[in-house]
Every structure is written in C-alpha cells, then in structure tokens.
Design a protein with these regions (language model features):
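Single conserved hydrophobic/aromatic residue that forms the stacking wall/gate
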Residues: 1-8, 12-13, 25
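Short loop/turn segments immediately following beta-strands, especially the blade-tip
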Residues: 9, 48-60, 111-113, 123-136
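Surface-exposed loop and turn segments in beta-propeller and other repeat-based domains
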Residues: 9-10, 14-20, 60-80, 136-169
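Beta-rich catalytic cores
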Residues: 23, 83, 117, 146
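Short coil/turn segments that connect the beta-strands within blades of beta-propeller domains
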Residues: 32-34, 92-94
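Short loop/turn segments immediately following the C-termini of beta-strands
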Residues: 41, 101
C-alpha cells in the first residue's frame, strides 16, 4: 500500500521525493452543458462535476483507474497500467471511453509496467440524471494482447460522433 497525503492540491507519495500533481491533460463538457469531466493522469482518477451552476461546481462522480496512488482496478482479469488520459464521451453522455497512455517517454518514467503490460481502454457508465460514474466491468480493450504488442492506446474516436470532437453525423 502506498502512503499518501494531501499538500495543497497535490498528492504526496512516500516513495516520491516531491509532491505529485494530478496532471490533467484534458477537460470535457457534456453536450447539455450539465457536466464537466476531467482526468488526473498521475493520481489515477476521472472526475465528473455538475456545473449547472457554474459558480458552484459539485463533484458528482469519481472513479479510479490506475495512477500512482495504487488504486488500479482489475477488469476481467486485466490490471490497469498507466492512468486515465484521453477520453471520449458519447453524444448522449452515458458512456465514456478512457485510454491510459499519455506519451511513451512519460509512460515509461511514471508507469514502467506499461512497457510489458500494454495500455487499456475502459468504459465508464455515466449517470446523466443524478450524476455519478461507474467503471463498466464487462468492457475492456487490452492493448497488451495486440499482435506484435504490447501496444499502448492514446486517442480513440467514437463512431457516429462524440462530445470531444467536431465529428458527428
């Protein structure tokens, strides 16, 4: 178990010489402008905030999917390596697809196990009525099992459109 403490907005991890920031590499607002999503690549969590009142955002969902804090889930026998990085939200806001590789050099530095294990894509079920997030335990794309792998996954696109690009039919 990794001991951690909070220093300001950064996490302090026993085996790291300095506080560890979350490293938010992306931010997303749902199509209905109700929810804001962000990732913390080093901490390992995805967050959902209700921004119906933009001056008073409320944390409504949080899931852990890797990261340096030792909270990596096992999904269908696959332990997640890396941290939440790129993500795509379906147009209805109910499904979020999250990948775990940011940049291979950084991946190797912070998550050396990703070299041999490979990356993954998971699906998070998002409650658009009440807020909340839950990792879908029936969905995983294990890029460690790819031919000529292990491979890493960075960005995906949602067929028919998604909330994070200007692609929709």
């Amino acid at each position: 178990e990794i001991a951690s403490c909070l220093v300001g907005s950064e996490m302090c991890i026993r085996d790291r010489p300095i506080p560890v920031p979350g490293v938010m590499s992306a931010i997303l607002i749902s199509m209905d402008d109700k929810y804001l999503y962000l990732n913390n690549w080093l901490h390992g969590d995805m967050r959902q905030y209700d921004i119906s009142d933009p001056h008073n955002p409320k944390l409504t969902g949080q899931v852990w999917m890797g990261g340096l804090l030792g909270k990596a889930p096992v999904i269908n026998g696959v332990k997640i390596a890396g941290g939440p990085q790129m993500y795509q939200l379906s147009l209805d806001g109910k499904r979020m697809y999250v990948t775990t590789s940011l940049f291979s050099t950084w991946d190797n530095q912070f998550y050396p196990e990703i070299r041999t294990q490979g990356g993954a894509m998971i699906m998070i079920d998002c409650d658009v009525e009440n807020g909340g997030m839950k990792i879908n335990k029936d969905f995983i794309v294990d890029f460690g099992k790819e031919p000529n792998g292990p491979s890493r996954c960075h960005e995906s696109r949602y067929p028919g459109g998604d909330c994070t690009s200007d692609i929709w039919l």
